[in-house]
Amino acid sequence: MTEQDAQELHEYKVLIDRYIDAGDGQRIEIAAEIERRFSVETTILVLDISGFTRLTSKFGIVHYLSMIRRMQLLTTSIITDHQGEIIKFEADNLFAHFPDVDAAIGFSLDVLQRFRSMNVSTNDHSDIHASIGIASGSVLVLEHRDAWGSTMNLASKLGEDLAEKDEVLVHEDAFSASRKKSFYATERLELMASGISIPARKIRG
């Protein structure tokens, strides 16, 4: 953790502790201060490796951990080529943010293509397939290592729960900001999650 990250974390803890102890009126002001200090407008990407249950039950957890490590090495090596920054790796997921939706889509298509190339030289049970979700909006970011907010939740829902393997799902609001719409072959979908309709674009990698 850098000195700046440590200072930001300390300032956040001071504010959130004040929020806990404050009355309703003060809480509104403190919440606004936290959002002003730590919120950023960004594009969130969540990548999830497909096949956890099947692969671990058949080949064991160490085999699956080796696949996670290969995913981490690949994505780390190319994310800056697409102006992205890794927020964190968690289990078999990658959480990252990008300056705009086109950068996130570009990374998605690149990484899925690289997985396909890697899979040519591996056995089927070692092949890596991933599902990816993308959403844009305001998020709270701390230490450059974690993020919270509805945009983060939406990207996670798209990437972990709704996208199929080798598929990219981009929330419609994020896709509408793309400057390269005509370059992508997409299918518009109306998805449902927890009783909520989620308009999205499906992009095949």
What positions do the PLM features span?
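Short beta-strand
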Residues: 85-89, 124, 189
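Alpha-helical scaffold within the catalytic cores of cyclic-nucleotide enzymes
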Residues: 5-12, 66-83, 94-132, 136-138, ...
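Catalytic NTP-binding/metal-coordinating core of nucleotidyl cyclase/transferase enzymes
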Residues: 8, 19, 27-106
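A secondary-structure boundary/capping signal
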Residues: 90, 135-136, 170-171
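A generic structural signal for short hydrophobic patches within well-formed alpha-helices
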Residues: 52, 104, 139, 174-178
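Catalytic cores and conserved motifs of cyclic dinucleotide signaling enzymes
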Residues: 142-146, 166-168
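Intrinsically disordered, glycine/charged-rich C-terminal tails and inter-domain linkers
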Residues: 1-31, 165, 170-205
